[in-house]
Amino acid sequence: MHDDRSAIAHAAADALERGRADGTLAATPALAGFDGFIDSIIRVVDRRRSMRMDDFDAIGTIPGFAGRVAAAAGKSANIELVVEEDRFGGNGPLYAGALGRLGMPTTYLGAVGRDDASPELLPIYEPFAARCEEVVPLAAPAHTDALEFEDGKIMLGKTAPVQAVTWERLVERVGLEGLRARCARSRLIGIVNWTLCGGVQGIWEGLINHVLPTLGEQGGEAAGPKAPRPEGMERRRRVFIDLSDPAKRTDADLRSALEVLRRMDELVPVTLGLNLAESERVARVLGVEAHADAPSLGESLRDGAERIRARSGFACIVIHPREGAAAAHRDGAGAWFEGPFTARPRLSTGAGDHFGAGFSFAQVLGLPLEQCLAVGCAVSGAYVRDAESPDLARLIGFLRDLPRAEQ
């Protein structure tokens, strides 16, 4: 199994090397949207050693933080938060920024503006824009306080500004023909954060009704001879969707969203990316058992991905817990890949977005399913270790020397 893991990772690295060398990667554009957040990366103070701002012991775990909050019931508490840095954020910018850093020509449309009415980019997004081929602000960003712990993170979101991102605003800013042209040249269309952006479902509907039926099958095409592709994994246009933690949305909302995406899949193959909790929720709404008893986590998640895929009707379902990732494809392919989990990440906010970027990046390049999983895990694994998005050289090197999961 470990030898297979290494062989898959090396094969993925070889494929990416070829894609860079023959120009395929540079001729595989992406379009992504539509949110935008400013993420404050925060540690929660447990005990101060002095009043120097960085001289403290942080609360290490989410249960430890929960206990501190619970102890204040019926009383009061003052919990100190130390902002380590402000970063450009939002599921969309993190996803698109990861694609751009890997060398994919990327257009981003989203809530990254100086204010709601301005077409100017907010300065904090300038490093993000430098990774992209084009960035079009649609509104001002929302704000997230990201409380980082050793065992996860708690995201406290203030989402009012991103509600301005709607189908009407999108067409107003880029024009219907401009949107069609951007989609027509894109092999990958990535749409994330349905949960917090009330206008995203309307954008899906607008794309289904006014854009996707007008597109050719392929999207941007690289010149030169093409290597044979596995059945069902050919290089064609794909849509990647990440709902982004729909726990706060009702079952009726989620059922409606899945039905819209089913209609989208009739026009362009849809891949739905889910973390473990999201997969359980989606399975429940669809009326299927997510993860039945199986000899291993990998088998359980692979089987669960296929059950969700079969019931949803989507081209591909990918599930990415911390331990690795599993996927099922319409062509009958199914796979599990053990990830390079680290117990002490330098940064965890954005890990899921980086997995989605890596997986969808590999998918539109035509890699086999298990290699797509390896690339997704490697992009995320490098990101949480380095606290920055990997470029293609870092990704290839990481795949060639992929760490074992830490216990």
Mark where each language-model region is.
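Ribokinase/PfkB-type carbohydrate-kinase core domain
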Residues: 1-73, 82-91, 100-334, 367, ...
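Metal-cofactor-binding active-site regions of metalloenzymes
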Residues: 76
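Short pre-catalytic strand/loop immediately N-terminal to key active-site residues, enriched for Gly-Thr
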Residues: 83-86, 339-350
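Short glycine/serine/threonine-rich phosphate/pyrophosphate-binding segments
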Residues: 91-95, 356
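Intrinsic disorder/low-complexity segments
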Residues: 95, 222-227, 345, 377
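Short, small-residue alpha-helix embedded
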Residues: 99, 281-284, 345-369, 373, ...
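Conserved glycine-rich phosphate/nucleotide-binding loop
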Residues: 337-344, 362, 400-406
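Short alpha-helical functional segments enriched in proximate histidine and acidic residues
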Residues: 383
